Structure formats: structure tokens, C-alpha cells
């Protein structure tokens, strides 16, 4: 699947992913009204509204982009009907030949981690049949529990030729509370360095140590185009850390959240990529799906919300392209 993602990026010239993170406050009144008239002001009505909203955006942008990234929590809040809308969205995007990155951020161990992996990437045994669950192409994974949590996902990826993006340096403001903590390397934590003869050691931030582990994992499952099926999540809001991690994880594709509404711009992104404009894919969610609520795109109005989303995609592609041109890439 990493091969397909790269091919789609090359075909579209757009190293971007649209985050399908619907909130009811983003859904135009006419869509909410139609959904509620059919199914009432219920969880079913809300799920129908976000599905119709998503479909409109997909229909207007699928020819411009390689991938989408639905955030499952935005669907889970509407219970089982919301999860059905999530699945419907995944399936529709795949019909449009888009790569689907399920933003699920799962993290557990053993059989539980394996069950998460099967639910979203693999197939479950049901009697004599093998049945796919949500069936995304990639998912995001939380590595806090270590290899016990990540390896089951890698195993399913190998079986299904799918991939994962592991959280390394996230875009949120408080990420540094843990991810930037300095840890001693080269000696066991707590050891008196003066008593360790001839061993060099230094302090590294936790995100860099996680990045080194991702680089190790990535070697287990390489694609045909120089990149692994095992990628990383690194926020656009931390470009200097991104520059470091690009070197630490040379074979891992980087999923880059934080563009647009969170403050990231095209010029913040250039060091996430290799010299061929590959190696990263940049996410924008509400900056695209709720573009019509932005003054810049207000001329489109709520009725033409999806046209506003299309224009926001075009503007994002242009912004990133101009950033590349400034450094001759």
C-alpha cells in the first residue's frame, strides 16, 4: 500500500491528505435539516448528516488528492450509527480510489493489539469465512506500550500489504511534556556515568528515541519505492524536530498533521521531504472540510461548502509547491 500511496502522490502532484474529521458545527444547515427530517434528531440523524457532508467533500476533491484521513473519534461520538458512517465513508473513498488512513491512534498489547489491527487492517475468522472489518489502508498507532503494542500491527501489515503511521512527535502544544523529555543514552538510566569507562553517552529527547525505534521497525517491511510500510507521525508545528527525524527515519514515510488551522505552513514542511518531493504526506482537516466558514472562502457560502473545500485543496497544493520552489526542489 505504500507503493500505491507514492504512486498517487506522484500522479496528483499533491503530497496531501484531507482529514475527514466532521463535527456537527461544520455541517451546513441544509444538510442537517435534510438528515433530521429523514431520521430525526437522533444519533442516526447525526450520522446521516456527517455522511452526506463527507460525501459532498469527497466528490469535489477526490480527483485532486491521493488520500483521506478520517478521525474515528468524530464518528464514535455518535455511537454505532456514527461507526456505520465511518465505515460508509471508508468504503466510498476506496471506491474513488483514494488511499484511506484511519486515524485511530490505537495502543495496547498482545491479543488486544492484534484485535485492533485485525479490526482496521486485516480479516477476522468467522466460521469458515474471513471477513474484513473497517478495512482501511493505513492506521495511526500509539507506541507508548512498546514493541508489544506495535508488533501485532506490523504482523497484520505484512499479511495484508498495508501500513501504519506511528506517533513520534505530535503537533499539539503539550506534546513536549513527554515527547521532549531528555533521556540518557549509552548508559543505563540512573547509572553513575563516571563509573562507566569508555562508554560515550548523551541526552536525547524521547521523540528521537522513538524515531530510532521506528527506523528499526521500518526495516521489517519495505516497499518497492525506497520507503517502508511502517511510517511515522510528526507535526508540522515542529519543523526543527521534523528536520531531525527525517534523518533519523530515512525509510519511513511521515504523516504530517498540524498544517493550516494548527499553524503549520508550506515553508515549515520542506525538511520533511526528500529531494524528490517524497517521504511525507501533509494533513489538513478543518482548514479544508470547514473552509466555507473561513472568511477567505466565504464567497462560496454554505450551499457550496464542497466547492470551498476544493479551492482550499488547490491553495494548499500551491502553498506547498511554492515552498519547494524556494529551495529548488
Describe the predicted segments one by one.
Residues 58-64, 92-95, 154-160, 246-249, ...:
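Acidic (Asp/Glu)-rich catalytic clusters
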Residues 64-66, 70-132, 241:
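N-terminal active-site wall of soluble small-molecule enzyme domains
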Residues 108-230:
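Conserved anion-binding
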Residues 236-283, 287-294:
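A C-terminal functional module that forms or caps the active site or interfaces directly
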Residues 12-16, 63-66, 96-98, 134-137, ...:
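Short, well-ordered coil/turn segments that N-cap beta-strands
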Amino acid at each position: 500500500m505504500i507503493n500505491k500511496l507514492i504512486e498517487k502522490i506522484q500522479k496528483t502532484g499533491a503530497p496531501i491528505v484531507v482529514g475527514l474529521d466532521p463535527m456537527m458545527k461544520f455541517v451546513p444547515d441544509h444538510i442537517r435539516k435534510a438528515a433530521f427530517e429523514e431520521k430525526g434528531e437522533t444519533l442516526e440523524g447525526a450520522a446521516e448528516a456527517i455522511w452526506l457532508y463527507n460525501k459532498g467533500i469527497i466528490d469535489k476533491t477526490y480527483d485532486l488528492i491521493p488520500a483521506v484521513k478520517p478521525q474515528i473519534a468524530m464518528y464514535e461520538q455518535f455511537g454505532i450509527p456514527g461507526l456505520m458512517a465511518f465505515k460508509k465513508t471508508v468504503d466510498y473513498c476506496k471506491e474513488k480510489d483514494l488511499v484511506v488512513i484511519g486515524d485511530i491512534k490505537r495502543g495496547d498489547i498482545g491479543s488486544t493489539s492484534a484485535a485492533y489491527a485485525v479490526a482496521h487492517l486485516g480479516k477476522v475468522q468467522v466460521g469458515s469465512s474471513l471477513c474484513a472489518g473497517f478495512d482501511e489502508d493505513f492506521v495511526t498507532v500509539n507506541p507508548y506500550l512498546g514493541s508489544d503494542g506495535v508488533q501485532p500491527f506490523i504482523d497484520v501489515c505484512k499479511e495484508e500489504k498495508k501500513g501504519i503511521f506511528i506517533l513520534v512527535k505530535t503537533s499539539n502544544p503539550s506534546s513536549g511534556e513527554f515527547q521532549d523529555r531528555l533521556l540518557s543514552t549509552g548508559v543505563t538510566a540512573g547509572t553513575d556515568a563516571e563509573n562507566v569507562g569508555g562508554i560515550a553517552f548523551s541526552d536525547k529527547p524521547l521523540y528521537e528515541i522513538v524515531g530510532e525505534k521506528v527506523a528499526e521497525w521500518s526495516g521489517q517491511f519495505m516497499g518497492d519505492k525506497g520507503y517502508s510500510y511502517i511510517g511515522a507521525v510528526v507535526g508540522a508545528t515542529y519543523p526543527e524536530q521534523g528536520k531531525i527525524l527525517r534523518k533519523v527515519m530515512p525509510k519511513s514515510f511521515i504523516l504530517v498533521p498540524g498544517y493550516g488551522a494548527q499553524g503549520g505552513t508550506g515553508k515549515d514542511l520542506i525538511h520533511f521531504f526528500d529531494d524528490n518531493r517524497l517521504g511525507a504526506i501533509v494533513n489538513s482537516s478543518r482548514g479544508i472540510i470547514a473552509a466555507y466558514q473561513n472568511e477567505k472562502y466565504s464567497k462560496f457560502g454554505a450551499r457550496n461548502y464542497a466547492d470551498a473545500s476544493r479551492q482550499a485543496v488547490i491553495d494548499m497544493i500551491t502553498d506547498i509547491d511554492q515552498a519547494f520552489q524556494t529551495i529548488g526542489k
